From Swiss-Prot:
Similarity field: Belongs to the SDHAF2 family.
Organism, as annotated: Drosophila mojavensis (Fruit fly)
Subcellular location: Mitochondrion matrix
GO biological process assignments: copper ion homeostasis; mitochondrial electron transport, succinate to ubiquinone; mitochondrial respiratory chain complex II assembly; protein-FAD linkage; tricarboxylic acid cycle
Name of the protein this chain belongs to: Succinate dehydrogenase assembly factor 2-B, mitochondrial
Targeting signal (transit peptide) range: 1-22
InterPro entries: SDH, SDH_sf, SDHAF2
Entry GO terms, CC: mitochondrial matrix; mitochondrion
Gene3D superfamilies per record: Flavinator of succinate dehydrogenase
Quaternary structure, from the entry: Interacts with the flavoprotein subunit within the SDH catalytic dimer.
Keywords, alphabetical: Chaperone, Mitochondrion, Transit peptide
Protein role: Plays an essential role in the assembly of succinate dehydrogenase (SDH), an enzyme complex (also referred to as respiratory complex II) that is a component of both the tricarboxylic acid (TCA) cycle and the mitochondrial electron transport chain, and which couples the oxidation of succinate to fumarate with the reduction of ubiquinone (coenzyme Q) to ubiquinol. Required for flavinylation (covalent attachment of FAD) of the flavoprotein subunit of the SDH catalytic dimer.
Length: 157
């Protein structure tokens, strides 16, 4: 028998084996939970406005800010370190692809799952920028990323 709880948009399913133990009301999540994410068709999400006349340097500065302020720590760390490392060297086309990636997706968890390989990346987002982000996430250099990089580095370049 399965017991189910709704938490926001996520459905957490726990087997009967784990539901027998006493769980406090504050902390009901365990590593054995299965999270099922589902789309809510009744929730209209506005499309991010395109900015075709925005100068490249202004766009890069906006993207640097948006990479740091995602609303979830996982993407804050991944995208801020990625932007810190690569954004200053992107050309206009690559910058537009990065803009589409971080602003075109309605759910930041999708970006996280695609970058970490948990979910398959849809064709429209499987670009050279996503491939570069996946390499960044693989972290072959074994760089520690416990905090976001300083903003002063980008401003000097």
């Amino acid at each position: 028998m399965l017991s189910q709880w709704f938490r926001g948009r996520h459905l957490v399913v726990r087997s009967a084996l784990f539901s027998r133990r006493r769980v406090s009301s504050e902390s009901t999540s365990t590593k054995d939970d299965v999270i099922v994410d589902f789309e809510d068709p009744d929730l209209p999400l506005p499309e991010y406005p395109k900015r075709p006349d925005e100068p490249l340097e202004t766009r890069k500065q906006r993207l640097m800010y948006q990479s740091r302020k995602r609303g979830m720590l996982e993407n804050d760390l991944l995208l801020s370190t990625f932007a810190h490392k690569y954004l200053k060297d992107f050309n206009a086309e690559q910058t537009a692809l990065y803009d589409d990636l971080i602003n075109g997706v309605s759910n930041d968890w999708d970006i996280y799952y695609w970058a970490t390989g948990v979910k398959q990346t849809p064709k429209e987002y499987d670009t050279e920028i996503m491939k570069l982000l996946k390499l960044h996430v693989d972290n072959a250099e074994r760089v520690t990323r416990f905090r976001q990089p300083e903003l002063t580095y980008y401003l000097k370049c």
